[in-house]
Structure formats: C-alpha cells, structure tokens
Amino acid sequence: MFGFFKKDKAVEVEVPTQVPAHIGIIMDGNGRWAKKRMQPRVFGHKAGMEALQTVTKAANKLGVKVITVYAFSTENWTRPDQEVKFIMNLPVEFYDNYVPELHANNVKIQMIGETDRLPKQTFEALTKAEELTKNNTGLILNFALNYGGRAEITQALKLISQDVLDAKINPGDITEELIGNYLFTQHLPKDLRDPDLIIRTSGELRLSNFLPWQGAYSELYFTDTLWPDFDEAALQEAILAYNRRHRRFGGV
C-alpha cells in the first residue's frame, strides 16, 4: 500500500486517506503519568481507562475495524500486589461505566490471552461484555489480558502437535495460515488478524512480546506521549504517519 495523504485546503491540515484496518496498541506510561502528578500508579491506570474509551470511539468513527490493546501481559504479575489487584478490577468498572456507551456505538468486545488464569471477577466482567456485544458489527475491541506472544505461539504448537498425533492433520498440512488458526486471534476474520499498525506510547522502543507472529509486517509507531494523554488528535497523527509509509511486505 502506498501511504498517500492529502491536505484539507480549507484549514490546511493533513487528512488520512488510508485508515489501518487493525491497530495494535501498547498502552504504556500510566505509572509515569501518575508520578508526574504526585499520585499513586493506580491513578494512572484509571486515567488510562478513560483514554481507551476516547481512542476506541475515535477509531470507530474513523472506520478502523479492529483494535487490540495490550492490557496486561504474562510478565505483569510481578508488579506489586496492590497494583495488580487494582488492574484486575478495572474490567469490572469498565463494564459498568464504559461498555454501555461502546455497545450503543456498535463496538464488539472480545478478549485474548490465557484468560482462564484471570481472577473470577475480571473474567466474568469481560465475559459479560463479550456476551452483550457479540452481535455488534462495528469495531472489534480486543483486550489482550494475561497475554504473552511467545506463550501464544508455544500453545499453538502444542495444539498442532496433538492434532497431528490424533491424525486430525498431517505434518504436510502445516502452513502459516494453519498456525494462524491456532492463535488467540483465530476469532478474527483472516484478513484482519494481523495489525497494520502497532502504536506504543511513552517513548519506549520495543514491542515487549506483543503479537510477535501477527505483527511481523506491522508498521510501528512510537510516541513520547504517555497513554492517559493519548487522545483523538494523537491517534490521527499516528494514522497520518502510517499514511506516509510504503508497506513493501518484503518487496521493493
């Protein structure tokens, strides 16, 4: 895809002409945002939830089809217990205070990761959100919770190996497409499983085990903006940066 963009002559601002179908977001910087305001880290996580609502509505309006947010990694369990407990309770608050509006805007909510290991109240809140929005046809909001990319691939290989042993598939049948059918993103339409654009906030320049298989050819966008400050204008700027690029997929 050639990343063309145009300028609105009336106001001289760039307007995206290509909107990425699937955007992955590493929502980083909540703790630093809170620290700058002399508040506890959990204060930043709460503000980050507000930012997610804002960005999801903006993306839905722009025509983005999927957003996958890195909400909690398999490595995040090593954080202080109080912080982990607070984060695990956020989906309950999200369901009560934010899901009704997303549902009204036709957003479909799903979760990916090793979700069977989540606390009961966390899993139940997200399951209720999935059930409530399952028939919606707008943007799909994927929550990656207790997610790790290497663990995802490892689990997929184990499942494929078992299916080979059970004679459900032959080794010769194993292709990249088949492996994709065993990953956590298997519920997505095949043409939407891989992010076109991955955004990481807070200035960190790494992917931290986020969608390593699906993101092989994703365009990467890093911004110093802390996640709670990432708003509709910041999303527009990320999409404009995406528009300026030429995706070659190994070609020329």
UniProtKB/Swiss-Prot annotation:
- Which residues does substrate bind? 29-33, 41, 45, 73-75, 77, 79, 200, 206-208
Known Gene3D superfamilies for this protein? Decaprenyl diphosphate synthase-like
**Per its UniProt entry, what is the enzyme's top EC class, as one word?**
transferase
GO MF term set: ditrans,polycis-undecaprenyl-diphosphate synthase [(2E,6E)-farnesyl-diphosphate specific] activity; magnesium ion binding; manganese ion binding
Which terms does the UniProt entry file under GO BP?
Answer: polyprenol biosynthetic process
Q: What EC number(s) is this enzyme filed under?
A: 2.5.1.-
How many cofactors are bound and how? Binds 2 magnesium ions per subunit.
Which segments cross the bilayer?
Answer: none
Annotated Gene Ontology cellular components are: cytosol
Q: Which Pfam families match?
A: Prenyltransf
Per the Swiss-Prot or TrEMBL record, the active site comprises D28, N76 (proton acceptor)
Names of required cofactors? Mg(2+)
Query: Which residues take part in binding Mg(2+)?
Result: D28, E219
What UniProt keywords apply to this chain's record, in alphabetical order? Magnesium, Metal-binding, Transferase
Please give the PANTHER family that the UniProt record associates with this protein.
DEHYDRODOLICHYL DIPHOSPHATE SYNTHASE 2 (PTHR10291:SF0), DEHYDRODOLICHYL DIPHOSPHATE SYNTHASE FAMILY MEMBER (PTHR10291)
Function (record text): Catalyzes the condensation of isopentenyl diphosphate (IPP) with allylic pyrophosphates generating different type of terpenoids.
Assembly mode: Homodimer.
What NCBIfam families does the database record attribute to this sequence? PRK14830.1, uppS
Question: Which family does this protein fall into?
Answer: Belongs to the UPP synthase family.
Its protein name is Isoprenyl transferase
Q: Which source organism does the UniProt entry give?
A: Streptococcus pneumoniae (strain ATCC BAA-255 / R6)
Quick one: which gene encodes this? uppS
